[in-house]
Swiss-Prot record:
Family of the protein in this entry: Belongs to the GHMP kinase family. Homoserine kinase subfamily.
Catalysed conversion reaction: L-homoserine + ATP = O-phospho-L-homoserine + ADP + H(+)
Pathway the protein takes part in: Amino-acid biosynthesis; L-threonine biosynthesis; L-threonine from L-aspartate: step 4/5
Keyword Transferase: yes
Name of the protein described by the UniProt record: Homoserine kinase
Localisation per UniProt entry: Cytoplasm
Any one GO BP annotation for this protein: threonine biosynthetic process
GO CC annotation, single: cytoplasm
Functional description taken from the UniProt entry: Catalyzes the ATP-dependent phosphorylation of L-homoserine to L-homoserine phosphate.
Record-level Gene Ontology MF annotations: ATP binding; homoserine kinase activity
Transmembrane segments: none
Keywords tagged on the record: Amino-acid biosynthesis, ATP-binding, Cytoplasm, Kinase, Nucleotide-binding, Threonine biosynthesis, Transferase
The species this protein was found in: Escherichia coli (strain SE11)
Length: 310
């Protein structure tokens, strides 16, 4: 039996639309992510468990874990009879890389079960392909950090899909999921087809400056440059209370904040534990909309997806 855990991730990080993402783990030791178990069997079977299992498609072939198994078998050119279990702990359409968690855990578990026939680059390419079936286009800003850990910059040149960018140990990521769903496809459809020249220049300056600040170890500058002129101005209308929440967390002391992925989760970066706690408390009282919502104080998950049992 192989059991694999794949962590939540926060894509875009305001400054890097479709090209930056960070894997996260709660500071209290809770596992914020999906778990997939693979065992040898006579025929294929899939069982769904976990807090959000009831939100999965009722038709097994529509389940992304089934599609991962099918695509992995196709890649190897043979049927691999296994019993798979998906522990769906991540809310769907949350902006926390929920589909990436399932895809990464499923493909990594299959690869481990079969003795690692695929290298990490090929596996990551498959992960992007499968996650793209849900989001509507192939992009790696959730699957890469989820699989490899840390903060990842998408490269997609010279057979390199992504590479790690150094993060800051003192940064705490407060993630507030309000409990409502925003579909990635809908959030992409709301974006303009063309952008003004000054927005393109500002975006390039912010992203280049952010990467420079990470490598030159300037956390204050990096946080200041986490601005979004590409997606947030258009997407915030999909997120009730988002603008007020951003203003409130800034007043409390967050050094940066924005939409995690395509939302509705809000991320707030803090450089002090007491500030992070106050931000988390405010968001818990004011940004959450129902019982399914939650707030976690997290750090970068530098390990990425990992085998829990083998």
């Amino acid at each position: 039996m192989v059991k694999v855990y794949a962590p939540a991730s926060s894509a875009n990080m305001s400054v890097g639309f479709d090209v930056l993402g960070a894997a996260v783990i709660p500071v209290d030791g809770a596992l914020l992510g999906d778990v997939v178990t693979v065992e040898a069997a006579e025929t294929f079977g899939l069982n769904n468990l976990g807090r959000f299992a009831d939100k999965l498609p009722s038709e097994p072939r529509e389940n992304i874990v089934y599609q991962c198994w099918e695509r992995f078998c196709q890649e190897l050119g043979k049927q691999i009879p296994v019993a798979m279990t998906l522990e769906k702990n991540m809310p769907i359409g949350s902006g926390l890389g929920s589909s990436a968690c399932s895809v990464v855990a499923a493909l990594m578990a299959m690869n481990e079960h079969c003795g690692k026939p695929l290298n990490d680059t090929r596996l990551l390419a498959l992960m992007g392909e499968l996650e793209g079936r849900i989001s509507g286009s192939i992009h790696y800003d959730n699957v890469a950090p989820c699989f490899l850990g840390g903060m990842q910059l998408m490269i997609e040149e010279n057979d390199i899909i992504s590479q790690q960018v150094p993060g800051f140990d003192e940064w705490l990521w407060v993630l507030a999921y309000p409990g409502i769903k925003v579909s990635t496809a809908e959030a992409r459809a709301i974006l303009p087809a063309q952008y003004r020249r000054q927005d393109c220049i500002a975006h390039g300056r912010h992203l280049a400056g952010f990467i420079h600040a990470c490598y030159s170890r300037q956390p204050e500058l990096a946080a200041k440059l986490m601005k979004d002129v590409i997606a947030e101005p258009y997407r915030e209308r999909l997120l009730p209370g988002f603008r007020q929440a951003r203003q409130a967390v800034a007043e409390i002391g967050a050094v940066a904040s924005g939409i995690s992925g395509s939302g509705p989760t809000l991320f707030a970066l803090c450089d002090k534990p007491d500030t992070a706690q106050r931000v988390a408390d405010w968001l818990g009282k004011n940004y959450l909309q129902n019982q399914e919502g939650f707030v976690h104080i997290c750090r970068l998950d530098t390990a990425g997806a990992r085998v829990l049992e083998n």
